[in-house]
């Protein structure tokens, strides 16, 4: 689920 957090960055 790191993909979602990376998108916010």
Curated annotation (Swiss-Prot):
Q: Which GO terms describe its cellular component?
A: extracellular region
Alphabetized UniProt keyword annotations = Amino-acid biosynthesis, Branched-chain amino acid biosynthesis, Cell wall, Leucine biosynthesis, Secreted, Transferase
Query: What GO biological process terms are annotated to this protein in UniProt?
Result: L-leucine biosynthetic process
Pathway(s) where this gene product acts: Amino-acid biosynthesis; L-leucine biosynthesis; L-leucine from 3-methyl-2-oxobutanoate: step 1/4
What GO molecular function terms would the record report?
Answer: 2-isopropylmalate synthase activity
E.C. number = 2.3.3.13
- For whether the record's keyword set contains DNA damage, the answer is no
Q: What does this protein do?
A: Catalyzes the condensation of the acetyl group of acetyl-CoA with 3-methyl-2-oxobutanoate (2-oxoisovalerate) to form 3-carboxy-3-hydroxy-4-methylpentanoate (2-isopropylmalate).
Reactions performed catalytically: 3-methyl-2-oxobutanoate + acetyl-CoA + H2O = (2S)-2-isopropylmalate + CoA + H(+)
Say where the protein is mainly found.
secreted
Family recorded in the similarity comment: Belongs to the alpha-IPM synthase/homocitrate synthase family. LeuA type 1 subfamily.
What is this enzyme's class at the first EC digit?
transferase
Q: Which domain of life is it from?
A: Eukaryota
Name this protein carries in UniProt: 2-isopropylmalate synthase
Q: Where in the cell is it found?
A: Secreted, Cell wall
């Amino acid at each position: 689920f790191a993909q979602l957090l990376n998108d916010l960055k």
